[in-house]
Amino acid sequence: MGTALLTDRYELTMIDAAMGSGTHGRECVFEVFTRRLPEGRRYGVVAGIGRLLDAVEQFRFTDEELRYLGDAAVVRPETIQWLADFRFGGTIHGYREGETYFPGSPILVVEGTFAEAVILETLVLSILNYDSAVASAAARMVSAAGSRPLAEMGSRRAQERAAVGAARAAYIAGFAATSNLEAGRTWGIPTMGTAAHSFTLLHDSEEEAFAAQVAALGPGTTLLVDTFDIATGVERAVAAAGPGLGAVRIDSVDLPVQVAAVRA
């Protein structure tokens, strides 16, 4: 999917109006920064730069997109011709991914003519806002976990493309793996997974489900133990995988209480 129409209409109408007034070619500097952080947060973590640079490199208007803009009378024909020839020729510089940022600090600076810089505004903010928010939250989790590895498994709770960005952002912040295969393919992130309750219910018993999973994936797999009774599920998981059991997963109930009980 292209990136050119992943923008707000007014970005293009501003360019259209600026072309009419002859100001679209004026050199400008745009800075990306946050005014404040959420309460209780002392810093944020930058992520999304790599995804953004890829998006800028691919930023082209297709013939179909240009026809849409013309048919919808979004901009004038001369502006459509400018869009047809558009290639970003400015400069982009800023923080590296994984670095911390604070309110007022310029995370990213885009320099170029007004038209070629402002056309990227929505795309820049869309990617950096989301990815940096995920990375900032993930960094706090990594800090709390200490030496224990964390895996990102949030794909089903995000829009499908955002899930890839979230997996990448979490990995940048220190997560060890993701369940998202597209993130693994595109960005080389280690992938992992467990099993769902449906897999357990597919079998005649929890023991049979665990045995099938261990037979397929080895004892180092992670077994889901809360389909029925957690305490019994843990016992069955250990019996199925032995001392080489990778981990058990709890997906419901009061997690802080149950996790502490299982670890004990």
In which residue ranges do the predicted regions lie?
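Glycine-rich phosphate/ribose-binding loops and adjacent secondary-structure elements
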Residues: S198-A264
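Ordered alpha/beta subdomains of enzyme catalytic regions
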Residues: M1-A216
